Amino acid sequence: MDPVRASAREIARAVNAREVSAVEIAETMIPHVAAVDEHLGAYLTLTPDLMREHARRVDARIAAGESLPLAGVPAAIKDNMCLLGTRTTCASKILEHWIAPYTGTAVERLLAAGALPIGKTNMDEFAMGSSGENSALGKTKNPYDLDRVPGGSSAGSAAAVGGFAATISTGSDTGGSIREPAAFCNVVGFKPTYGRVSRYGLIAFASSLDQIGPFARTVEDAALTYDAMGGHDPMDATSVDMPFETTAGHLREDLRGVRVGIVKEFATSDLAPDVAAAYEAAYADLQKLGAELVEVELPTAKYGLSTYYLIAPAECSSNLARFDGVRYGLRVDGADVGEMYEKTRAAGFGPEVKRRILIGTYALSSGYYDAYYVKAQKARTRIADDFRRAFATCDVIASPAASSPAFAFNAKSDPYSMYLMDYYTIPVSLAGLPSLSIPCGSALPEGGSRPMPLGLQLASPLFSERALLGYAHAYERATQHAIKLTPDPHCHPELVEGPR
Amino acid sequence: MAATDAALRQAQGDTGLRRKYEAVIGIECHVELKTTSKMFCGCPNEFGGEPNTKVCPVCLALPGALPVPNAKAIELMIAAGLAFDAEIPAFSKFDRKNYFYPDMPKDYQISQFDMPLTQGGVVHYWLPDGTKKSCRLTRIHLEEDTGKSTHAGSGDGRIAGSSYSLVDFNRAGVPLMECVGEPDIRSADEAVGYLEALKRTFVELGVSDVKMEEGSLRCDANVSVRLFGAPEYGTKAEIKNMNSFRSVHDAIESEIDRQIAVIEGGGRVIQETRGWDEAAGVTHSMRSKEQAHDYRYFPEPDLVPLELDRAVVERIRAAMPPVPFERFERYTEKFGISVKQTTQLVDNPALAGYFDRVVTITNAPVATLNFVLGDLSRLANESGTAVIAGKVTPEALAELIALTEAKTINSKIAKDVLARLWADGGSAKSIVEGEGLAQVSDPGAIAKFVDDVLAANAESVTQFKAGKENVLKFLVGQVMKTSRGKANPELVEALLREQIAAR
Amino acid sequence: MATERIDVRGVARLARLALSDEEIERYGAQLEDLLKHVDDLKQLDTSDVAATAQVIESRNVMRPDVLVPCLDHDVVMAGAPQPQHGFFRVPKIIAEVG
């Protein structure tokens, strides 16, 4: 078994069966990842010693007779998730040297399930961005074309899995930050229903939207990872106290009887021709699997961006107030504490973060609160209602995850053009629905020379994770698009370390 | 325009001015709730300790931490509201109040804006002379306390002039009730009465310790004056930095005088915040320019709303003890106990509860009061134990009182029996019957004692007949001695007078 | 809605962000651009819906009043930018940092 290429399911089976030890897995991955990451830039911090320590613990537990769902599986953790003793930066200068003194619940559960922490991955600063370019601490590249962006905000987590520098990884999704980079990096990226995975330990961007979810190269691996992380947490008052329905092992293999909603307002004719063609083919593939395609309408989806870009910044302007130089993180001194605040935050936050803090503060401010924040929260209700109505006639909605494949660095200098990358994912986030992106083919990007991955977004009703992952699994089984593309030579598992 | 010293002095001494102007006062209090743990995390809710030793990711506002509300704090809040007849709405939620300050770990405070846990209500209280008063409540809401800053480098610990501050977050996150009173208060005495009522009620309910010196009660007063009969309120000033009920009283008095002096001097009162300077006995303006806060309130997205089930509210109401004011009315009006003694009892809820239980049995409140506040409390103080922790059960005391009321034993014997009960517990009746301590009231028997004593004290008889009244006391004492304390003293006195007159 | 100029300086002050004149201009323009887009919400009729507070329907999520171990003091102070005698030191507070 080759740990670099193997799936999480294969690795866990082999480690549990004691065919290979977790320590061996770790010792294989550590040099491999270091070598690949020289080119990929997925990680901000590599944690080889921690990985070895966890590997030893896993082996000891296996020896004592335990069986762990993710035994020995190499995992990358997005750097907005607290992991005790590791630098946790949110890719921001304001936390550049901060060491987390505790581990968040989802990560804790992942490691308790046997996963091995490779390191902390790069991201758009404080999860604000759709390309990874807003990181203040590193540059992550798309594993399929190192001159293109991996997507964001979970740039490094998507790139690591897509670039065979991790088997699974954790991401966070607020408006599309798992789904869009998954599409760009040719991997499965899954955002559960809001409240299914604890946010305790996830450094908050927008509290009512943030969710943690997995990246993996197969749907089953994503399911295994979600099963390990998810479930009620008393430390997070917004985590739902409902019986947790596991997903792996319950994944269907066809789509007979499934009604797939195709959104009238998300017409493929809006897209570039070969991108449109890829999606049309994807919809046809769904039909071939037995699904019935149904047209659904989401008339208010077009207000998603406006709604999101009022609510998310408002919440983040408040969530990021705590970065004030008093108790941790960067401090730039001032003659008085007010000056210290202003200088610290000016030096510590990048432009996109500042933009969102400004717009959010404005939207909440006296005289504007009703017109902006409250209005947006009402629009959100309308959007969620549209989805509810749509799900009366379909079981799952299919759409592009993004309007184009990965673009080149610096291609979108205008902030609003970047925001448009989340056009399809944002409405789903606003409704809190479970949603994922799964590789569905490729297209030649504008000005590009090689085809780049495309992702199909699937979204289903609240708390229907098992069904959703099932639909994706059926589609993946029949189409296997991911393996049809070859990553950049620096990331291709065949070419890096030679035969194993 | 500031008041001149002369004008101020004149105002302070001039009760005529006080008759001309009416003071209007609204009190805003912050009361720390007495829970084991903090409002949103499991750190200890305790006064004191080394700095920054009672903190966790949540109350320190580390990245990634999330709040979860303390169920007990909510329950105590509801009890507090019910104690003042406030309305407990069916639905309540938390909101974020956004502002930057070094002792605010999140740089926002989780508080309640438009849907507080209680609405309205009335605080009934009494003045030292027994006058009953009331002040309406606007609302009481739940929030979290901030950390504590100490200001260094200025020599006097005040912010102004300090060069740096040191922050301790042990207090950050402690649950806090904010009680906002309507401007129904009209004097410094009333303000103190109101605060005492709050304090008594919260202590009785176990909701808070309410110790101003420990910071578990902090209050600000909004003070304005107007001519009596004026339809509009005057401009108010907010007074802060009062550290005791005494300070509150003095600060309000001082501020009323100041405002009157300003107006009498032709000036206008400015709306501002003023700090009480205890040493100087005056308030100082705290702000150079008025800056309105934009708190940007919005519903707290990390918490879910509270739906307050009526059954739960009723359960809390049923478990509550009577409020102090209820006791005050019952004791002063129904039982005829003095305001002073009533206050004494009410200030000791455990003792008042004991008293109530005894009165339920004896139906003799005055007699009960005399025992409870008199000999029983004395015995308790001497042994350093609280009455309720002692061996005299309410039933035993009631029995003793019944025996006294029925004149089965006299007051001296009662005292002795009480001391025995305090030391050993048991039943008054058993002791009295067992040792034959019943008062001797048989006129024949007493007559015999009286005879013996008069025979042995002829000079005393002569002295009494000559007009020395207090000799009678001596003679009564002798009869008591002869009867080993058991003679009925009233009968003894009556018989003595009779017999002396007959001699 | 977004027709008048945004007081970027005022907003920046509320958010405790020091911005240069150039940044005020730049961010101001970008914010106004975003607000122009956001203006489309005016066309959406929201008169008969309630604002979403949370997408989940939970109520009354609370914790029992019990103690949980605190963070070790040394760990707490290890991350402090300027620890002093176990406190967090900050520059002088000008009375109303409101």
Predicted regions: what they are:
Chain A
Residues 22-27, 56-59, 247, 271-297, ...:
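Acyltransferase
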Residues 35, 108, 163-169, 174-272, ...:
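Structural helix-boundary/capping segments
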Residues 1-52, 288-289, 362, 484-492, ...:
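An N-terminal boundary/leader segment
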Residues 70-212, 265, 313-314, 399-416:
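Short glycine/serine-rich loop/turn segments
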Residues 49-56, 114-115, 124:
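Long amphipathic alpha-helix in the N-terminal Rossmann-like dinucleotide-binding domain
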Residues 58-74, 221, 251-261:
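Immediate post-signal peptide segment of exported/extracytoplasmic ligand-binding proteins
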Residues 29, 51, 103, 222, ...:
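Residue-level signal for inorganic ion chemistry
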Residues 12-13, 300-304, 322-430, 486:
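Serine-dependent amide/ester hydrolase catalytic core
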